[in-house]
Amino acid sequence: MAEGSYRKESEGYNVEDMDEGSDEVGEEDMVEGNDYEEFGAFGGYGALTSFDIRILRAFGSLGPGFRILANEPWELENPVLARTLLEAFRMDPETLANETAARAANVARAAASNQAARAAATAARATYNQVVTNHHPVATHQASGGDTQPMTSAAQAPAATPETSVASPHSSRMLVNSEMAAPGAPARSPQPQTSSQAQEAAAEGPSTACAFPQASRASEMDATRPKTAFLGQNDAFDFSQPAGVSGMAFPRPKRPAPAQEAATEGPSVASRGTQAASAGEGAATRPKTTKSGKALAKTRWVEPQNVVAAAAAKAKMATSIPEPESAAATSQQSAEPWARMGGKRTKKSKHLDDEYESGEEEREPPAVPPTWRASQPLLTTARPQVAPRPSMALRSQVPSRHVLCLPPRNVTLLQERANKLVKYLMIKDYKKIPIKRSDMLKDVIREYDEHFPEIIERATYTLEKKFGIHLKEIDKEEHLYILVCTRDSSARLLGKTKDTPRLSLLLVILGVIFMNGNRASEAVLWEALRKMGLRPGVRHPFLGDLRKLITEDFVKQKYLEYKKVPNSSPPEYEFLWGLRACHETSKMRVLRFIAQYQNRDPREWRAHFLEAVDDAFKTMDVDMAEEHARAQMRAQMNIGEEALIGRWSWDDIQVELLTWDEDGDFGDAWSRIPFAFWARYHQYILNSNRPNRRGTWRAGVSSGTNGAASASMLDGPSTSSTIRTRNAARTSASFFSWIQ
């Protein structure tokens, strides 16, 4: 396979399986549309090699699914390195066992939770049915006895006993409930009851006959106080009122335009008596049963309890009439459970003393005049009583059918994902292009996106303790991250010895910008570079195209900002310090670099020196605040030294492969990682066996007799920890040696 070519391999991905090895990322999806520059860690400048494809595949799975393409020149030439990479990326058997056990525990926990939810729902329904049976025996008896008791004659209906004719408070309340349960009964003319009505009632059975005196008594009671009314056709539901048990407000279904509508002049005493009498006729609308026991008649739509309570409260507020008994009855009814069961288009609700189950297409709205409340006169100014909100205990009787089962917080799995993020960050930082949070979530975090703060904090802790570098978020809006080597002054900018020419040029550009008031026009910058023998139209043997390097590469890497000068004609551009430059270096370092080249004291530039000191103090305050916040976050997440305990996959790599070689093979993946990182990692390995030298390593000094950090803040960090890094510092100080 030729370099720069790639092959797409797509495999299925199962989120519930949580198997990292089965999640392969297609190279075409990762590389397409970014001109190979968005993935700055892979390949040379502007080229994607075959080994980059293998690295992409490795970080797509990082588990048992890691494979290297067969019959490739790189593997034939470096069989030992290929075998070493396979051993490095192969996951520890103990870790695989832990992941398998955690996955099995997660599946078992989800199954147990769903089973418990189903059992709780079944128990709640059984308790609910038992409460209905115990508290409403009269309704059950009336519902069942309407078809089984013998028929009575018309003469028996008016000759009822005084106990039957005189309605008790409980009977009248049940009658009012029956009015509310069957509000859709057609309105009668305001005429007294005739013998034909009595005969019709006698034909229906004694239960209907007994309802007539109760209806008469209820109409007399309604003459002294207003009846609870439903919302009209053009009235909107008041969502400010307390909701029912389920916590949801169900809107009323749309009313069809009735052909026969009652007059809108407002309910009179006679019309109220007619409505009460029609409630007795509502008993005749109970569905008849056939041989199969199925209901033939359609049941009418029943308003939910929260709608009833809200309508009653709103009606009382409009009429300003005290209604203590009706409010108590309504609040007692609203306290009963109301459950919306899952299904296609079916609702099952508990309303008063009957259960209704109907589809939306079978619901019929009540025939209530829309202007009833508007025509009701104001009689008194008593303060209305608002129905109380049901308690949380009643609300929790019916559990939700959909139980959200989140994956458990497994510290071992989170630390493994953090270790993968460390490798991903170090390799992708190869070209110094800021790393996006979206790329980390897509390539490494994946299904653990809910634990992203903890994973990235664990990765930051590992980077600090093992490699001596920090993960910085330089842009809070776009969420861009960079790696900063805080202990090594020569590795802060660009970070590699092969980039020494770029490092020197960048320091010169930053110095020109700083000495010209923190902004330099393009003409001023090129004039300074011409004095050094650098011209924009001439290709440099080490730097290549200078204009592209300064206006594109350094801008992409966030070392510089290239902006258009406002209100300039013809258009002019200027350079400023970028976000990465502000984090990787400081104004004091740049000023000391310029003074070292000219053999002068930085204090001779008094204004710039004071500005650099002020910038150093501000940076120190920001770093201290971030360190304090980071310490608190790690204490809450229990992140400590245990994050460094365990097998690290790079420990098995041969030592010679971890050493940077300027003339070495650039196909080696480990040579792509900045040399200063590996120097820090080797120093961590050495000091881990010598606890007395751990403080020296953290101070940034690993060789010589300078065992303590510099006493002066202006002196900056100490010297490099290796000979190659010291040579890079010397070369950057005397940059004229390679320019000429």
UniProtKB/Swiss-Prot annotation:
This is Melanoma-associated antigen D4. Gene3D superfamilies: MAGE homology domain, winged helix WH1 motif (1.10.10.1200), MAGE homology domain, winged helix WH2 motif (1.10.10.1210). Residues 141-155, 162-175 have a biased composition (Polar residues). GO terms for biological process: negative regulation of transcription by RNA polymerase II. It comes from the Eukaryota. Residues 1-27, 139-208, 242-298, 321-377, 697-722 are annotated as: Disordered. Keywords: Tumor antigen, Ubl conjugation pathway. Residues 1-11 have a biased composition (Basic and acidic residues). Interacts with TRIM27. Signal peptide: none annotated. The gene is MAGED4. May enhance ubiquitin ligase activity of RING-type zinc finger-containing E3 ubiquitin-protein ligases. Proposed to act through recruitment and/or stabilization of the Ubl-conjugating enzyme (E2) at the E3:substrate complex. One of its GO terms (cellular component) is nucleus. Residues 414-612 form the MAGE domain.
